[in-house]
């Protein structure tokens, strides 16, 4: 019997070698399993893998939902309700996709916060950081278009408000808005193109994630101490050590995910989106999804439409400049006492902006939003360069 098994194994190996010589997919997988990683990574380094799992879930559920969705203003709302009532486990698919978007953004926001704290944007990882911010921007575009598809009141008026922002561009703004709408108002052509782009953009995100991984593997992961790996004893193979650690993170992630799907599926949404879109009735309070609220607060903080648009886009663009705005040679905030305080003040400011973005556009929220928006830019444009110049960091360790 053992004589029968041995040739079969050899034949299998020969086939694998033949394929791998022409298409090195098995060598690629082997590289991942033997990839050397800093030995002191904490659970915060699980967030990249968790975001990857969230992206896969969004693509799978999105493709299946698209099979039952009708991108037409007369049928979109009803098709979503049909998915909820008549499609087998349609309610589960829709809630998984809707909650999954929030979970995806939560993982990415924590991933970005970890990068800010440990200086993962510093040399030689500038391009790694830039690709990550491009992924974040693409996610925002995808999520916005997806929010329009149910064609409820918030969907319609959210699309109207956000697309109208482009009208603030001098000379060509109105033409751009008409081009985006495919007509003179948000209507069927708008819904069709948003559906098409919402289907396309996740696959562009996958391509960007591949680039992100290539950039990551070029210089390896940063670590909590923020120092470079100096010897092989500072590293361990990614598998099995960090794959096991990732599975622990996945377990926690899916417990939280399942809680929202089965117990609070609409907690992060807005009840007005269960009302069919009506161009003649404006909601009392137009609110975007929670993950857009800090930027929405910055947009509303400025009376001028053009000024608000510039600040809103500037609040994201400033992240591209971060590798050069932070002048400190030390990466990790663990060894930067002043920056560590500034970081947590900045985190509190972002949470405050998120809260203010969900409040009505009235006093005192507008005034507080202006102060919070000012501090947001102060942190990047003033505090970081000055802290890096004058801060005295703690002594760095010699090894991990």
Swiss-Prot record:
The gene is petB. Belongs to the cytochrome b family. The main subunits of complex b-c1 are: cytochrome b, cytochrome c1 and the Rieske protein. The keyword Oxidoreductase does not apply. The lineage of its organism: Bacteria, Pseudomonadati, Pseudomonadota, Alphaproteobacteria, Rickettsiales. It holds the Pfam family Cytochrom_B_C. Component of the ubiquinol-cytochrome c reductase complex (complex III or cytochrome b-c1 complex), which is a respiratory chain that generates an electrochemical potential coupled to ATP synthesis. It is a multi-pass membrane protein. This is Cytochrome b. It comes from Rickettsia bellii (strain RML369-C). Binds 2 heme b groups non-covalently. Heme 1 (or BL or b562) is low-potential and absorbs at about 562 nm, and heme 2 (or BH or b566) is high-potential and absorbs at about 566 nm. It is found in: Cell membrane. Heme b b566 binds at residues 111, 212. PROSITE patterns: CYTB_CTER, CYTB_NTER.
């Amino acid at each position: 019997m053992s004589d029968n098994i041995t040739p079969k194994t050899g034949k299998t190996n020969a086939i694998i070698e033949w394929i791998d010589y022409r298409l090195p997919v098995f060598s690629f997988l082997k590289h991942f399993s033997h990839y050397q990683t800093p030995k002191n990574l904490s659970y915060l380094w699980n967030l990249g893998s968790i975001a990857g799992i969230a992206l896969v879930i969004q693509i799978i559920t999105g493709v299946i939902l698209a099979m039952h969705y009708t991108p037409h203003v007369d049928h979109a709302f009803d098709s979503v309700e049909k998915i909820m009532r008549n499609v087998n486990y349609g309610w589960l698919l829709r809630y998984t996709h809707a909650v999954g978007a929030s979970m995806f953004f939560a993982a990415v926001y924590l991933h970005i916060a970890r990068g800010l704290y440990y200086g993962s944007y510093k040399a030689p990882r500038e391009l790694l950081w830039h690709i990550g911010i491009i992924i974040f921007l693409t996610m925002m575009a995808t999520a916005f278009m997806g929010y329009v598809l149910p064609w409820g009141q918030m969907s319609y008026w959210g699309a109207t408000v956000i697309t109208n922002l482009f009208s603030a561009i001098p000379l060509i703004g109105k033409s751009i808005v008409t081009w985006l709408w495919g007509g003179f108002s948000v209507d069927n052509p708008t819904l069709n193109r948003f559906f098409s782009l919402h289907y396309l953009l996740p696959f562009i995100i996958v391509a960007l994630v591949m680039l992100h991984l290539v950039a990551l593997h070029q210089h390896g992961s940063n670590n909590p101490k923020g120092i470079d790996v100096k010897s092989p004893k500072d590293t361990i193979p990614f598998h099995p050590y960090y794959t096991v650690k990732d599975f622990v993170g996945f377990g926690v992630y899916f417990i939280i995910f399942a809680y929202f799907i089965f117990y609070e599926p609409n907690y992060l949404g807005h009840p007005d989106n269960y009302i069919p879109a009506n161009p003649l009735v404006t909601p009392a309070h137009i609110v975007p999804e929670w993950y857009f609220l800090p930027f929405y607060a910055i947009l509303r903080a400025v009376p001028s439409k053009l000024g608000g648009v510039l600040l809103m886009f500037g609040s994201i663009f400033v992240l591209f400049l971060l590798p050069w705005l932070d002048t400190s040679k030390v990466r990790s905030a663990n060894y930067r006492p002043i920056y560590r305080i500034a970081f947590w003040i900045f985190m509190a400011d972002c949470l405050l902006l998120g809260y203010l973005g969900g409040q009505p556009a009235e006093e005192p929220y507008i005034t507080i939003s202006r102060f919070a928006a000012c501090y947001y830019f102060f942190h990047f444009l003033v505090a970081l360069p000055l802290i890096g110049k004058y801060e005295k960091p703690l002594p760095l360790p010699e090894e991990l």
